[in-house]
Amino acid sequence: MNIKSEFFRVDFIIGARRLSNYFWATVVFLGSLGFFIVGVSSYLQKNIVFFLSASDILFTPQGIVMCFYGIAGLFLSFYLWFTIFLDIGSGYNEFDKKKGIISIFRWGYPGQNRRIKLSFPIKDVQAIKLEVKEVLPARRMIYIKIKGQQDIPLNRIAENITLREMEDKAADLARFLKVSIEGL
C-alpha cells in the first residue's frame, strides 16, 4: 500500500515479515527440534517421540553431534523468529514536495540503531539509479543519488520484481521528483 498525491508520496517497505521467512523459520525450527530430540533419545536409550527412532544411533559420537546441531538450529530459528517479530528492515520512503524533504525510515535491531531515519532536501537529489545484476539470485535495485552522499537503496535487496516493474517504479518516482534516471 502506497500513498500518492501531487505533493506527497509514501512508499512502504516490507521487512522481515515475508512468507518465505515464516516458512524457513518454521522449517529450521522443526528440523533442529527433530535433531535435538533424536540426540536426547540416543542418550536416554529410548524413543521420546514415536516417529523419531534413535535405536540405531550411539550417543557417542552421533548423539552428541545431533544434540549440537539441534541446539545450533534452535538458536538460529529463535533468531529468525525474533527478526520476524521485530519486522527488521520494514519502513517507508517519504517524499514531501511542500516541505522539500525526503525521509527514509527503517526498523533495525534493538539498541542504538533501532530506528534508522535519514532525511535529505529534495533539491540535493541528483537522479534515480537502477542497478541490475542477472546472477543467481537476480538483484534489481533502485537507488536515489544524493549530492555528497552514497547511493541510498529504496527497495529491499531480496525484493523479487520484474525488470518492467522496476523501471515503472523508477520512472514514476523520477517524474514525481523531476530528476533523471541512470543505469541500465
Swiss-Prot record:
The keyword Chloroplast applies. GO terms for cellular component: chloroplast thylakoid membrane; photosystem I. One of its GO terms (biological process) is photosynthesis. It is a multi-pass membrane protein. The keyword Cell inner membrane does not apply. The chain crosses the membrane at residues 21-43, 63-85. Keywords: Chloroplast, Membrane, Photosynthesis, Plastid, Thylakoid, Transmembrane, Transmembrane helix. It is found in: Plastid, Chloroplast thylakoid membrane. PANTHER family: PHOTOSYSTEM I ASSEMBLY PROTEIN YCF4, PTHR33288. Belongs to the Ycf4 family. Seems to be required for the assembly of the photosystem I complex. This is Photosystem I assembly protein Ycf4. It comes from Chaetosphaeridium globosum (Charophycean green alga).
